[in-house]
Amino acid sequence: MTIRIAIAGPRGRMGREAVALVQQTDHFELAAVIDRRYDGQNLAEIDGFSGVNAPIYTDAARCFAEVKPDVLIDLTTPEAGKRHTELALRYGVRPVVGTTGFTPEDIERLTKLAEEKEIGAIIAPNFAVGAVLMMKFARMAAKYFTDVEIIELHHDQKLDAPSGTALKTAQLIAEVRPSKKQGHPNEKETLAGARGAEYDGIPIHSVRLPGFVAHQEVIFGGNGQTLTIRHDSFDRRSFMSGVKLAVETVMHLHTLVYGLEHILE
C-alpha cells in the first residue's frame, strides 16, 4: 500500500532528509509540502529540490482539505508543530511529529482528539533509534543507581533547552526512581544555575555549540563506581530510520503514542 505523505518544513535540515527518505522509499509518495513561503509553487522549482514534484502550501488546513494525505511528517518549530498536529487530526490526517515542546496537557488533549477521530498519531522527541535505546537503558539503570545527571549537547541554533530527549529521559528515570535531592544537603550555588535545571530532582545540563548535532549522556553514580550511557547523532540521517518506522506504524494506530520507544519491539 502506498502511503501519501505531506511534509511540513521541507527546506529545513531535518525536512530535507525527510524529503529524501520519502523519495527513496518505494511505498511512500510525497503528496505535498507545507512551507512558510512559495505558496502555489512546486517544490521542484526550489533550489536543491530538482525533480521533486510536490505542490507547496503555506496554509496547512487547505493542504489537508485539498490533498488529503495519509500522513503528515512535521519537523518544524514547537509553535508550528502543535498547530499542525491538531489541524492534521481534525482533518483525518495522521501526524508523525519530531518537534519538541509539547506539554503533558498538550499530549492529553491531542490523545483525546486522536481517539475521537479513531486515527493514529506519533510524537517523538527523538527519532534516532540509538537515542531511544539510550533512554530505555537509562530507565533500566535508574532502578539500581538513584543518583543521576543528564548532559545534552546540541548545535547552537536549537531553540529549546533542555532538549525534548533530555526531558523524556528524566521522565522515564523518574518513573522508577524515588524523588530525591542529590548532592550535599547544604550545597550552595555561588553562580546561579551552576547545577543546571532540575526535573524531579534530576539535574539537566544543556550545552549549545557549533559543531554539535545531537548528543546526550546520562551519568549514574554509586559507591566506588559510575555508569555513563551516551548517544551521538553526527548526521541528521540518523533520525530517518525512526521516521520511516513511525510513518509505517501510525497507519495501524487508533490513538496517540508519545515516544518512539513505545513502538520498538
Swiss-Prot record:
Chain positions recorded as (S)-2,3,4,5-tetrahydrodipicolinate binding sites: 155, 164-165
Enzyme Commission code: 1.17.1.8
For this UniProt record, the keywords arranged alphabetically read as follows:
Amino-acid biosynthesis, Cytoplasm, Diaminopimelate biosynthesis, Lysine biosynthesis, NAD, NADP, Oxidoreductase
* TM annotation in the entry: none
Catalytic activity of the protein: (S)-2,3,4,5-tetrahydrodipicolinate + NAD(+) + H2O = (2S,4S)-4-hydroxy-2,3,4,5-tetrahydrodipicolinate + NADH + H(+); (S)-2,3,4,5-tetrahydrodipicolinate + NADP(+) + H2O = (2S,4S)-4-hydroxy-2,3,4,5-tetrahydrodipicolinate + NADPH + H(+)
Which pathway does it take part in? Amino-acid biosynthesis; L-lysine biosynthesis via DAP pathway; (S)-tetrahydrodipicolinate from L-aspartate: step 4/4
Q: Which residues does the entry assign to the active site, renumbered to this chain?
A: 154, 158
The record's comment on protein family reads:
Belongs to the DapB family.
Q: Name one GO molecular function term.
A: 4-hydroxy-tetrahydrodipicolinate reductase
Q: What is this protein called?
A: 4-hydroxy-tetrahydrodipicolinate reductase
Which GO terms are recorded in the biological process aspect for this UniProt protein? diaminopimelate biosynthetic process; lysine biosynthetic process via diaminopimelate
Q: Where does the UniProt annotation locate this protein? A: Cytoplasm
Annotated NAD(+) binding lies at 9-14, 98-100, 124-127
Name its species: Geobacillus kaustophilus (strain HTA426)
What job does the chain carry out? Catalyzes the conversion of 4-hydroxy-tetrahydrodipicolinate (HTPA) to tetrahydrodipicolinate.
Instruction: Give the residues the record marks as binding NADP(+).
Output: 37
Q: What class of enzyme is it?
A: oxidoreductase
Report the GO terms under cellular component.
cytosol
- Report the Pfam families cross-referenced here: DapB_C, DapB_N
